[in-house]
Amino acid sequence: MGLEDAGDLVLHIVLSKIGPENTARVACVSKRLKVSASEESLWSIFCSNDLNISTPLDPHGDPAPSFKRAYQLWRESFRMYPWNLVKRVRLCWDNLKQWLTLNFPEAKATLRKGVTEDDLQEFETSLKVKLPLPTRLLYRFVDGQELSSPNGLDGSLGLIGGYSAYSHDVNVYLLPLKEVMRETKESFMRDLGFSSRLDLIVMAASVVASLKIFLLDCTTGQLFTGTSNRQLLPCVPDALVRSVHDTNGDQQQDAMLLWLEEHGRRLQTGTINVRQQNNVKSISLFPEIPPLCSVSVTNGVQVRASSVFIPEISNLRDQPPAYWYAYSIRMSLMPEGCILNGTHHSSCQLYWRHWVIRADNEVIDNVNGEAVIGKYPLLQAGEEEFVYESCSSFPTTAGSIDGSFTFVPGSLRDPKGSQFEVKVVEFPLELPDYIF
């Protein structure tokens, strides 16, 4: 039995399995198959699978007369790119937008409408570079972020996010194409000392005081960030970057695409999340879940600890090298309170800290002292975490910190019992495969 002899339901199932390209070929066989291959329900499946759209929209977001026509318009608009790469980039942005919609709509509102092929051509001509295919596509879908907004929260809405330690604040935005051009032509070449690398362009930067930028090598497709002495560090494993200028096949992946995909994965899995401080929300790059975040509970006191590599103040050419990390400590008292010898206390207060600092599994320092950053947090049962950040340098790429906090039940002014130690489980401070 041939396809023409199959029932409508069987034919629909078969066509949905063979995909849009083969369905278009089947439509050329006979009038009956052409009718079946043009059904809206069929092309709605193709649009959903390939483009994640549930209504017929063209690439500009405008309504199309049918799902089939919408699919055709998408294919025509992106005909100069491998289709599998188009679908992958679309999925990358869809995942990021979906997360932002649910968790950080203020940042989603800063995403700009994608650029045109003419915009990309003008950009490449002006800077005399050839963008990797995945990066071109990323900008076809989204032209970075608006860097100004009426709410005055510009420094906190970066898509990549950031961290803080003492007075060192970072919040990284994905730059729109016009800012990539301006930063590359003006600030970057004049101020940052990389002018010999003419294939480098500025793709992302922190808009707050700290100097942190991300640079794309348009020839190799690798993404870099700089250290305090202008050394370039790859932000993505080199082995993963390939075929960045190949218009054929489906193996193209540059560091920008890999970087944003990994960032989206961390957001979606809850590895990193939005933090609100002083009524200002931002994406915090401090990991929130194991194994990159340690979690321990002692006598009702929970302590979470994690770190972020700080390349912009590191100096890897020092002897010994200085790998700098920010670390975040979050402590809270569980709803049942502090439990000592069977007695529940509704509060406890920090008195003392003890750190054991290791590099390459060897103890390099023991730190003992009162308070943390000059504070003695009073924890109340069931209330929000007390959070503090600090930073430290290591002579190697692999370090860790563990130790303990000494608390007093009740408060320091009105103790309700003897001091007790709260364990801080070891957390890593290591040079990561992906640098954000």
Swiss-Prot record:
GO CC list: SCF ubiquitin ligase complex
Subunit structure: Part of a SCF (ASK-cullin-F-box) protein ligase complex. Interacts with SKP1A/ASK1, SKP1B/ASK2, ASK4, ASK11 and ASK13.
Pfam families: DUF525
Annotated organism of origin: Arabidopsis thaliana
GO terms classed as biological process: protein ubiquitination
Note on domains (UniProt): The F-box is necessary for the interaction with ASK proteins.
Domain F-box as annotated: residue spans: 75-111
Function as written in the Swiss-Prot or TrEMBL entry: Component of SCF(ASK-cullin-F-box) E3 ubiquitin ligase complexes, which may mediate the ubiquitination and subsequent proteasomal degradation of target proteins.
The protein, known as: F-box protein SKIP16
Keyword annotations of the record: Ubl conjugation pathway
Domain of life: Eukaryota
UniProt pathway: Protein modification; protein ubiquitination
InterPro entries (alphabetical): ApaG_domain, ApaG_sf, F-box-like_dom_sf, Knr4/Smi1-like_sf
Residues of the ApaG domain: 295-436
